[in-house]
Structure formats: structure tokens, C-alpha cells
Curated annotation (Swiss-Prot):
CDD domains: Kunitz_PPTI-like
Residues annotated as domain BPTI/Kunitz inhibitor: 18-68, 72-122
Keywords linked to the UniProt accession: Disulfide bond, Glycoprotein, Protease inhibitor, Repeat, Secreted, Serine protease inhibitor
Site (Reactive bond for trypsin): K28, N29
Residues carrying a glycan: N29
Recorded family membership: Belongs to the venom Kunitz-type family.
Location within or outside the cell: Secreted
Gene Ontology molecular function terms on file: serine-type endopeptidase inhibitor activity
Disulfide pairings: C18-C68, C27-C51, C43-C64, C72-C122, C81-C105, C97-C118
PANTHER family attached to this UniProt entry: PROTEIN AMBP
A GO cellular-component term linked to this record: extracellular region
Protein name (record): Kunitz-type serine protease inhibitor bitisilin-3
Length: 151
């Protein structure tokens, strides 16, 4: 149930919509907007037609940056509702995706349905542990080991 004065999100969490491509939309009232480019991890300018499009659309670079770029440093946030469910958030202190209890509405963007989604969004590839994988072919690979100054 919703607590008085709260409302459910009617759009996906930023972690989901920040990965959508820039969308001009069908209208022709062209204006400059910003979208989050997940490939470059930056907020970029795009031309918006003025209607529909998608939720990866911000009036200012700052709004885009606060919504999409910095989500991984936000704390876990329960939110004001009472529909408790397990979710994952990125804990920047431990550099891991951890479980937390989410109330079902509001909260913040550091909120992922799966650990894998959290890792893809927040964990830097160079701090992931080496994984051998399920196959039995032996192929040489390089591994970056942080804190070791050897070549």
C-alpha cells in the first residue's frame, strides 16, 4: 500500500531508461536536449522533436548527469511505500552490488532488479574478479591486478 502523499513511479527507474538510445520522437518542434550515452558514460546533446520520444531525455546536462552518471554513488534508499521487496544497489565503499529492501516507490536510481543489472551499470570492468567460465578450452588471457606494480 502507498503511504499518504506518495505515488508510484509510472516510468522505469533511471538505471533502466538511462540505457535507452536518444529518441527524436515523431514531432517537428526541434530543440536541443541531453541524453545519457551509456557507451561513453557521458551526457550528450541530441535533437528532440518535442513529443513522445523516451525517458532518456533531459532539459539540462546537469539533470542528465545527476540522474544517470552519478547513480552508482547514491546510498540504498527504501522509499516511503510498504511493498517491501529485495533489490540490489551498488555499494561504492565495497565496490560490490549488495541486496537491500526496497519499499516499492520513489527511492533513488541506485536500485536494480538483478545483481547482473547492477554489475553491468556500476562495476568497473577492471575491478571484476577473473572468471574461468564453464568451458574447458585453455586460452591465454591478460588480467589486470590492482595494487600490483609488475608487468
Amino acid at each position: 500500500p502507498l503511504r499518504p502523499g506518495t505515488e508510484k513511479h509510472t516510468f522505469p527507474f533511471p538505471a533502466e531508461f538511462c540505457n535507452l538510445p536518444a529518441d527524436l520522437g515523431p514531432c517537428k518542434n526541434y530543440t536541443g536536449r541531453f541524453y545519457y550515452d551509456s557507451a561513453s558514460n557521458k551526457c550528450e546533446v541530441f535533437i528532440y522533436g518535442g513529443c513522445p520520444g523516451n525517458a532518456n531525455n533531459f532539459k539540462t546536462r546537469e539533470e542528465c548527469r545527476k540522474t544517470c552518471v552519478e547513480i552508482c554513488i547514491l546510498p540504498a534508499e527504501l522509499g516511503p511505500c510498504d511493498e517491501y521487496t529485495g533489490r540490489f544497489y551498488y555499494d561504492s565503499a565495497s565496490n560490490k552490488c549488495e541486496v537491500f529492501i526496497y519499499g516499492g516507490c520513489q527511492g533513488n536510481a541506485n536500485n536494480f532488479k538483478t545483481r547482473d543489472e547492477c554489475r553491468k551499470t556500476c562495476v568497473e570492468i577492471c575491478i571484476l574478479p577473473a572468471e574461468l567460465g564453464p568451458c574447458d578450452e585453455y586460452t591465454g588471457r591478460l588480467l589486470l591486478r590492482l595494487g600490483i606494480k609488475q608487468m
